[in-house]
Amino acid sequence: MRSGEPACTMDQARGLDDAAARGGQCPGLGPAPTPTPPGRLGAPYSEAWGYFHLAPGRPGHPSGHWATCRLCGEQVGRGPGFHAGTSALWRHLRSAHRRELESSGAGSSPPAAPCPPPPGPAAAPEGDWARLLEQMGALAVRGSRRERELERRELAVEQGERALERRRRALQEEERAAAQARRELQAEREALQARLRDVSRREGALGWAPAAPPPLKDDPEGDRDGCVITKVLL
């Protein structure tokens, strides 16, 4: 192994592989987070990286294009990016460290972790929490009753307003009928007054006319000796 490069035992590599392969999903749980190699946050991690680490840059070769095997210290060209060159890392491991791979079980998926037991039924509240819930329930019931009482009062007020509106309209009709009756009575009174004035004029005209002469009376002694005496009243 070259100097300055960290060494890694098979147990440490196997632990990294187990951590990388652990990601079984359970109902209701999200996927397990995927580990990432040092210095590259968010990049997918392959089990092969448990046996390699990035080699420092060399003259003519940019940093990140070479990976150093933790088992033998050999540098393997992998190309830029963490997705590129993973097959080259696996080829090196299968060709140079097949025995270690078989003994560690790398490349095979470990059994998924058991799912946590489902949550049991919620325990009944006790103490202050129970009293608080009871008070909240009582307040809710009281508020509901208050709302119903207010609704009944509003309905009664609306009914009273409608009754008052009907009464007001009836009074307006009565006032219009009374006004019509007053107009009719006024017309009749004026007609009677006109007739009275006409009768008064007629009576006045009759009072100024000359009196008619009384009728002539027959004198029983007027017919004497065959003479007719005519009495003239002056």
Curated annotation (Swiss-Prot):
Keywords: Cytoplasm, Membrane, Metal-binding, Secreted, Wnt signaling pathway, Zinc, Zinc-finger. One of its GO terms (biological process) is positive regulation of canonical Wnt signaling pathway. Residues 111-122 have a biased composition (Pro residues). Signal peptide: none annotated. A zinc finger (BED-type) spans 43-104. One of its GO terms (cellular component) is cytosol. Secreted in blood plasma, and expressed in skeletal muscle and adipose tissue (at protein level). Induction: Induced in blood plasma by hyperglycemia. Decreased in blood plasma by hyperinsulinemia. Zn(2+) binds at residues 69, 72, 92, 97. Residues 19-42, 94-126, 202-225 are annotated as: Disordered. Residues 216-225 have a biased composition (Basic and acidic residues). It is found in: Cytoplasm; Membrane; Secreted. GO terms for molecular function: DNA binding; DNA-binding transcription factor activity, RNA polymerase II-specific; zinc ion binding. PROSITE patterns: ZF_BED (PS50808). Acts as a positive regulator in the activation of the canonical Wnt/beta-catenin signaling pathway by stabilizing cytoplasmic beta-catenin. Involved in transcription activation of Wnt target gene expression. Plays a role in symmetric division of blastomeres in the early stages of embryogenesis via regulation of mitotic spindle central positioning and organization of the F-actin filament network. Plays a role in regulating the distribution of cellular organelles, via modulation of cytoskeletal dynamics and cytoplasmic lattice formation. PANTHER family: ZINC FINGER BED DOMAIN-CONTAINING PROTEIN 3. Associates with the subcortical maternal complex (SCMC) composed of at least NLRP5, KHDC3L, OOEP, and TLE6 via interaction with NLRP5 and TLE6. Interacts with AXIN1; the interaction is direct, enhanced by protein kinase GSK3B and casein kinase CSNK1E activities and decreases GSK3B-induced beta-catenin serine and threonine phosphorylations. This is Zinc finger BED domain-containing protein 3. It comes from Homo sapiens.
